[in-house]
A protein has these predicted regions:
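Short acidic-hydrophobic, aromatic-tinged amphipathic segments that line or gate anion-handling sites
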Residues: 151-159
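Substrate-recognition element of Asp-dependent hydrolases with the DxDx(T/V) motif
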Residues: 22, 26-59, 72-85, 124
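Conserved hydrophobic residues forming the short capping helix/wall of the S-adenosyl-L-methionine
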Residues: 62-67, 101
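Active-site neighborhood of HAD-like aspartate-dependent phosphohydrolases
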Residues: 1-35
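Short helix-capping segments at alpha-helix termini
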Residues: 66-72, 105, 146
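Conserved Lys-Pro-Asp/Glu-containing loop-to-beta segment of HAD-superfamily phosphomonoesterases
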Residues: 88-121
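Acidic, Mg2+-coordinating phosphoryl-transfer loop and its flanking beta/alpha structural elements
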Residues: 113-152
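Alpha-helix N-cap and loop-to-helix initiation/capping positions
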Residues: 13-17, 50-57, 91-92
Length: 166
């Protein structure tokens, strides 16, 4: 929902390409006083497709791009585990969201958690956050599945920012 995704994984900084309007949306929200944090499953680390250093470089590109637009990127929390490792942080489990809540010393009750997959929405529900589906990225496929009650649906991250900023 921030960058183009691939079933073959995004393995290099050169492959990390933002979706149209996503970086501007994050910067607009940030400039308006919103904290934008990211919770992301990164099983490509466990699979050996890329290194932590490469992932951190991708995250730095995200931070730099948002900063160039006058915004600030908040915490980027990621799960490095594979789907069969039994960790507590891989979405749909709430571990990544709990890390974000602890970092900001806040409750996530009612906080908007925006994602493009069912596991994103399930993680939101697990911490009593507001599940928000964007149809960009893998969201169109997700929209066809049964969604958690009260899921809000928007075209993309820009539409979410437009709604929140009124």
């Amino acid at each position: 929902m921030i960058n183009y995704d691939s079933d073959a994984y995004i393995k290099t900084v050169a492959e990390w390409i933002p979706l149209p309007g996503a970086l501007d949306a994050i910067a607009r929200l940030s400039r308006a006083g919103w904290t934008v944090a990211v919770a992301t499953n990164q099983s490509g680390l466990a699979r050996g497709y890329y290194s932590v250093a490469t992932l951190e470089s991708m995250h730095q590109v995200l931070r730099d791009e948002v900063q160039q637009r006058g915004g600030a990127m908040g915490l980027i929390s990621y799960c490095p585990h594979g789907p069969d490792e039994g960790c507590a942080c891989r979405k749909p489990l709430p571990g990544l969201l709990t890390q974000i809540a602890e970092h900001y010393q806040t409750s996530l009750d009612g906080v908007w958690f925006v994602g493009d997959s069912l596991r994103d929405l399930q993680a939101a529900v697990a911490v009593n956050a507001q599940p928000v589906l964007v149809c960009s990225g893998k969201g169109e496929q997700t929209r066809e599945k049964p969604l958690p009650d009260n899921t809000l649906i928007f075209a993309d991250l820009s539409a979410v920012a437009d709604h929140l900023l009124g």
